[in-house]
A protein has these predicted regions:
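A fold-level detector for beta-propeller and closely related beta-sheet-rich head/sensor domains
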Residues: 1-191
């Protein structure tokens, strides 16, 4: 059982997993096992149309301008808390957790595919279906995908809760810097 969570006053979120026999104590909480900011596998929809690693060096001049021409905004969005207002010299909004609020997005579990006997049909690709489900797809890691108002579609290992990836669509790049300022200017991004 998976539950998306959020704290409205601070606009932070979490993803919890429960055993169906014990719905009181979580098996894991995603924010307890989040990778360090610079270790997160974050991608974004670049101006070029390709997905690129969400790093300052990968941004075009126009994309850097969207983020205010400072790498500290990107660092904040990756989860760096150094420049949050609670710290000396901090200028960005405090967050309870680095995972954005998961309000109207339900976690979607993606596991190994079921054999739906598509191989018996004659449309393109049908004959290779059995090879697909009996190959690498059979042992793929179960993943949970959920959209957050931190502007990312997150992918978590469903067994451990560790974030495996995050994707920021190009369409939400422009409002992201407003998330650093105040909860009153918080953009509702990926729901």
């Amino acid at each position: 059982l998976y539950q998306a969570r959020y704290v409205a006053g601070e606009w932070s979120g979490d993803l919890w997993a429960y055993d169906t026999e014990d719905t009181v104590t979580p098996i894991w909480k995603a924010t307890d096992v989040m990778p360090a900011p610079n270790s997160r596998n974050l991608m974004y929809g670049a101006d070029s149309g390709a997905a690129k690693a969400f790093t300052w060096s990968n941004l075009s001049a126009a994309e850097k301008t969207l983020l205010g021409d400072t790498s500290t905004v990107l660092d904040y969005l990756r989860g760096d808390t150094t420049l949050e207002k609670r710290n000396p010299g901090g200028i960005y909004r405090n967050r309870g957790k680095i995972l954005g609020d998961l309000v109207n997005s339900s976690p979607e579990l993606v596991e190994a595919p079921y054999d739906l006997s598509y191989h018996r049909y004659n449309w393109t690709g049908a004959s290779s279906y059995r090879s697909f489900i009996e190959g690498a797809a059979k042992t793929r890691t179960p993943m949970l995908y959920v959209g957050g108002n931190d502007g990312m579609l997150h992918g978590f290992n469903a067994n451990t809760g560790v974030e495996v990836m995050g994707y920021i669509p190009k369409a939400v790049m422009a409002p992201l810097p407003s998330d650093t300022v105040s909860v009153l200017k918080k953009a509702l991004a990926i729901e």
